[in-house]
Amino acid sequence: MHVPDGCINAPVSAATGLISLGTIWAYIRSAKNLVADRLIALTGMMSALIFVLQMINFPIAAGTSGHLLGGALAVIVLGPSLGIICISIVVVIQSLLFADGGLSALGVNLLNMAVVTSLIGWLVISTWKKLFNEGYSSIISGSFIAGLLSVVFSSIAFVLEYAIGGTVAVPLGSVLIAMVSSHVLIGIGEGIITGLIVSLLLRVRSDLVYVNQNKENKNNPTSFYGIFILLILLLTLITPYASSSPDGLESVAESYGFN
């Protein structure tokens, strides 16, 4: 889902950068009162986990793959403020150190992958909890829906940006259908991964899951950090075996000639 350089023109790239920075700065300010040692550690570990997960592409159809975006997962575990900061850190590191997504497109990628996914993920999980009960099953099912919809809306955001500032003329209706279709499948994968990780965290350290209202915890904190580190190590080991097929955006871009 990383947008490369030259896909979106300079004015729109600059505008998305300003919107992203303004939104992220607002959440940084609101997070000042939330910062504690355990939250800093948890945010760092979530950033590392999502960073590794974004490197692992899973196949969704013949010749196409997808990977976790992580916005919904981050806000469910960390809350909206620290969640959006967590994903922003991941996107910036990927752009600056690994050239994953163009530097001139950093604002676009921050908006789509950090801001949109986090805000949609938080809106969905918050609404889901109001409509249904506060139990673990509600949180887990809501996590799946939040993950799915966050990816779909991120793909729609890209099409809107391309409609305004795309550098190559394309049939926007067809591109929208192709983007949403492929990202519904990717979103299902995102929802499953999000639900599984949230389920694991609820079992190990339920008090550290932000959306969980029952903060009582009787689990050993050592088991939480141990499992978290082990999960990151295992994911790192399987990264070389991830799908090498182009992701949803790359596949659509190749089909319509705006890559």
Q: Across the structure, where does each feature detected by a protein language model lie?
A:
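Hydrophobic transmembrane alpha-helices
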Residues: 2-73
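Hydrophobic alpha-helical transmembrane segments
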Residues: 14-15, 40-45, 84-88, 111, ...
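Hydrophobic core segments of alpha-helical transmembrane domains in multi-pass membrane transport
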Residues: 16-29, 47-54, 118-123, 147-159, ...
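Alpha-helical membrane segments and adjacent membrane-interface helices in multi-pass membrane proteins
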Residues: 54-117
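Alpha-helical transmembrane segments and their helix-start/interface "positive-inside/aromatic belt" motifs
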Residues: 69-70, 135-147, 219-230
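Short helix-perturbing small/polar motifs within transmembrane alpha-helices
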Residues: 112-154
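Glycine-rich ThDP/TPP pyrophosphate-binding loop and its adjacent helix/strand module
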Residues: 142-147, 157-218
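Juxtamembrane non-transmembrane "cap" segments at the membrane-aqueous interface
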Residues: 153-156, 244-259
